[in-house]
Amino acid sequence: MTNSIRIGTRKSPLALIQTNLVIQQIKQFFPDINCEIVPIITSGDLIQNKPLYDIGGKALFLKEIEQALLDKKIDLAVHSLKDVPGRIPEELVIAAILEREDPRDVFVCLNYKSIEELPQNAVIGSSAVRRKAFIQKIRSDLKVTVFRGNIDSRIKKLMTAEVDATILAYAGLKRLRAFNPEYCHLIEYSQMLPCIGQGVIAVEIRQDDNAMLEICNQINHLPTFELIKPERAFLEYLDANCRTPIAAYSKYLDADNIQTDFMLGNLDCSKIIFHTEVTDINTSKEAGIKAAKMMLNQLDK
């Protein structure tokens, strides 16, 4: 067993908090291992003035970190699973998942408590086409404008009235201790399905690194690992990018069965399809692929 681990992560406050959550899990099982955090600036962090879909998608938050992993400059990487594309380099693997935080979205607004309450033609700041699709479904009059940056910077922009409202993930707000019920309002799943993998912290390693695999096997939260399989299979089959409105949310019906709600839209968000699959744990990945095939056919009609 190794005595030291180099852990690659983005430099944002949220990324560092999430990395420390992983370290806490490692220390529970391997208290004598030294964990060194290696902050890495990614292309996604550097380019803030353009929508992700114009510059390469969420993979830009992983590119430099995964390269450091491939170059053996780090031993494992910590990501928000929602930023991980359906397909990753074949030499790498998502080997551990931490227990999922509440994956719901949050409506953040100083003067109103819901999207429905916003005045006519109000402006919502969001760069996610998934959120744009749901916003337009709820209120077609609203304007959605590009709104990037970390959680703190987005809330500051909201406070200075650059936009009327924004939408953020609850998990990030909670981990940063930035969820304020005075202006943060949870959005139910029935109104807005989460991003695939939202609320989940993922650990990525090299496929052939047995020492890291042993550690990941210990810290992996198996119920969550199984739960996100249909979501990830759906994403992988579609090979979706940041231009595609796509969402999925899985939950346990009982110890052996999973229900997954899927959403897929066309590029201009004018057509949105929903579908639900119920499957046992052993076939949940196949359910995600089945849903992707069926919904893709419906979208093309």
From Swiss-Prot:
EC number(s) per entry: 2.5.1.61
Cofactor details (free text): Binds 1 dipyrromethane group covalently.
- Which is an annotated Pfam family here? Porphobil_deam
The answer to whether UniProt assigns keyword Nucleus to this entry is: no
Which enzyme class? transferase
Give, as in the UniProt entry, the pathway in which the protein acts: Porphyrin-containing compound metabolism; protoporphyrin-IX biosynthesis; coproporphyrinogen-III from 5-aminolevulinate: step 2/4
GO process annotations (BP): protoporphyrinogen IX biosynthetic process
Highest taxon above the source species: Bacteria
Q: Which UniProt keywords apply?
A: Porphyrin biosynthesis, Transferase
The family classification in the record reads: Belongs to the HMBS family.
Function noted in UniProt: Tetrapolymerization of the monopyrrole PBG into the hydroxymethylbilane pre-uroporphyrinogen in several discrete steps.
Misc. remarks from the entry: The porphobilinogen subunits are added to the dipyrromethane group.
Q: Tell me which NCBIfam families the record gives.
A: hemC
Q: Under what name is this protein listed?
A: Porphobilinogen deaminase
Q: What is the lineage of its organism?
A: Bacteria, Pseudomonadati, Pseudomonadota, Alphaproteobacteria, Rickettsiales
